[in-house]
Amino acid sequence: MNYETLASEIRDGVGGQENIISVIHCATRLRFKLRDNTNANADALKNNPGIIMVVESGGQFQVVVGNQVADVYQALLSLDGMARFSDSAAPEEEKKNSLFSGFIDIISSIFTPFVGVMAATGILKGFLALGVATHVISESSGTYKLLFAASDALFYFFPIVLGYTAGKKFGGNPFTTLVIGATLVHPSMIAAFNAMQAPDHSTLHFLGIPITFINYSSSVIPILFASWVSCKLEKPLNRWLHANIRNFFTPLLCIVISVPLTFLLIGPSATWLSQMLAGGYQWLYGLNSLLAGAVMGALWQVCVIFGLHWGFVPLMLNNFSVIGHDTLLPLLVPAVLGQAGATLGVLLRTQDLKRKGIAGSAFSAAIFGITEPAVYGVTLPLRRPFIFGCIGGALGAAVMGYAHTTMYSFGFPSIFSFTQVIPPTGVDSSVWAAVIGTLLAFAFAALTSWSFGVPKDETQPAAADSPAVLAETQANAGAVRDETLFSPLAGEVLLLEQVADRTFASGVMGKGIAIRPTQGRLYAPVDGTVASLFKTHHAIGLASRGGAEVLIHVGIDTVRLDGRYFTPHVRVGDVVRQGDLLLEFDGPAIEAAGYDLTTPIVITNSEDYRGVEPVASGKVDANAPLTQLVC
């Protein structure tokens, strides 16, 4: 995929640079803050093959591009004038969002930059717990201590990391707020807290005011409030101080004022709020944990669709900080794996080649916790699989809620989550409930989506399983070899990236070449078997004797002609020789109907070859050498 081209199209689609305030990215989405969302062309973006979905939520215009989002983001920032939008802080004069939208925007901007690393360290901590539970590793060993420190460092020093990202979001100097966060977890402050636990401790004072020392390691809310206060203080200081001294006097005054204020007022108040929040959640969860599981399992992916899931992140992290574990995060595992199961059901059932390709990559992402490609690319467009995934999530999460399954480290809900629900005391019934609940969600969604989730017209194979096809397929299996493809058409040779359809031009369907035909007769480019013939007759697939899988697509978007102007001369399962007539088409009539006749010839298993090398250029005659396949 050409990320620069896609980035340019996204920039133009959101209304150009003049409409952009800022842009960040998460695991699968570019999150724009725009001056006016109505200036963006959402329909054009949705129709771009490189884009999975467009969502407007939480005061953000979100463009879902999938797992390659980091590459697209870097390509976007590399465009002229775009780098200045990477800072997530929006100018004050821009229009204000609703309170809830603003909250979602703040949370996503603060936590997005390091959420991947946070998930990775959580997974590492889970594997260490599994190793201890199975006696593979001892807690007293040097190996364990080193890896545990790596897995725990980010969470222990949370105030430092959050200080930096919060400072950026609130529009201040992120290094100033980083220092405030570092002060909260400085060894001398932790030592002062430990000393205060002694019955005969002496109280320390700041300018005569007693200091309440609190262990702020792993804390979330105190540094967020402290960073906000510091950034609010920084703006007037920058206005009042002369430019010659502003660079060091502003941070100095922010630190001197904010740090004592945090220890004396902000920290204790925020800690009290954190404890109230954690206690309130525990109380609600305790009312009916089974119902809580069913509700979260059913609705989690709905929250993801609208980008509202970020609102739960502070609650989860606060639970880890205050209680030491969390019962909300494990309920999301069946919700995620439910969508993965639904995607697998579609993958195994559909005969639509494009949907099957999307489902394959989306399934692999979903089992590792990234569900946006599955939801936007597969289950939500078909509706029923999405619903089946949500129902499966509800069933599985209800089982886990009933057993009070608990997670002991943060991470994306995924197949790795099983290691993170192992208690320090070892495997118990709550762990088995996690396994059973997740398998229930996955199996239910997969089976129902396979049975009822795919439209009937997609369940009919494009290529009948005739004896000829089966024999040819078996003969070709594992027999890929060097082969020459001859031109199926007379016309002008084009590079595949010159094709107007990005699905072909991007190479996602495979490597190949294209021809702009001058005659309406399509010939077999190889010896082989007709593996597929679309019911609209505009495209044909061949399985060559050399093992190549060749797709020939006559024209761009010609599927809309519904078979008009195409006359096939072969059927699925026919064995053909190179040069046999496959089909005829009325080129002038197709062009008069407004369609581009450019015909991609793609090797859909091109990954099996070292090279797919054109040997013709310019004008080419039918049945002349066109492409060399090199193993």
Curated annotation (Swiss-Prot):
Q: What membrane topology does this protein have?
A: Multi-pass membrane protein
Annotated PTS EIIB type-1 domain ranges read: 1-86
Where is each PTS EIIC type-1 domain found?
Answer: 105-466
Q: Which residues cross the membrane?
A: 120-140, 146-166, 175-195, 206-226, 248-268, 295-315, 328-348, 358-378, 385-405, 434-454
Recall the GO molecular function terms of this protein's record: kinase activity; protein-N(PI)-phosphohistidine-sugar phosphotransferase activity; protein-phosphocysteine-trehalose phosphotransferase system transporter activity
Q: Which residues belong to any copy of the PTS EIIA type-1 domain? A: 501-605
Cross-referenced Pfam families, in alphabetical order? PTS_EIIA_1 (PF00358), PTS_EIIB (PF00367), PTS_EIIC (PF02378)
Group of enzyme by EC = transferase
List the active site.
C26, H553
Q: Where in the cell is it found?
A: Cell inner membrane
Name the keywords, alphabetized: Cell inner membrane, Cell membrane, Kinase, Membrane, Phosphotransferase system, Sugar transport, Transferase, Transmembrane, Transmembrane helix, Transport
Q: What is its EC number?
A: 2.7.1.-
Primary localisation category? membrane
Q: Which SUPFAM superfamilies match?
A: Duplicated hybrid motif, Glucose permease domain IIB
Name any Gene Ontology BP term.
trehalose transport
Which Gene3D superfamilies does the UniProt entry name for this protein?
Glucose Permease (Domain IIA), Glucose permease domain IIB
Function, in words:
The phosphoenolpyruvate-dependent sugar phosphotransferase system (sugar PTS), a major carbohydrate active -transport system, catalyzes the phosphorylation of incoming sugar substrates concomitantly with their translocation across the cell membrane. This system is involved in beta-glucoside transport. Acts both as a kinase and as a phosphatase on ArbG.
Query: Domain text from the record?
Result: The EIIB domain is phosphorylated by phospho-EIIA on a cysteinyl or histidyl residue, depending on the transported sugar. Then, it transfers the phosphoryl group to the sugar substrate concomitantly with the sugar uptake processed by the EIIC domain. The EIIC domain forms the PTS system translocation channel and contains the specific substrate-binding site.
Instruction: Return the PANTHER family for the record.
Output: PHOSPHOTRANSFERASE SYSTEM TRANSPORT PROTEIN (PTHR30175), PTS SYSTEM ARBUTIN-, CELLOBIOSE-, AND SALICIN-SPECIFIC EIIBC COMPONENT-RELATED (PTHR30175:SF1)
Q: What is this protein called?
A: PTS system beta-glucoside-specific EIIBCA component
Taxonomic placement: Bacteria, Pseudomonadati, Pseudomonadota, Gammaproteobacteria, Enterobacterales
Q: Which gene encodes it?
A: arbF
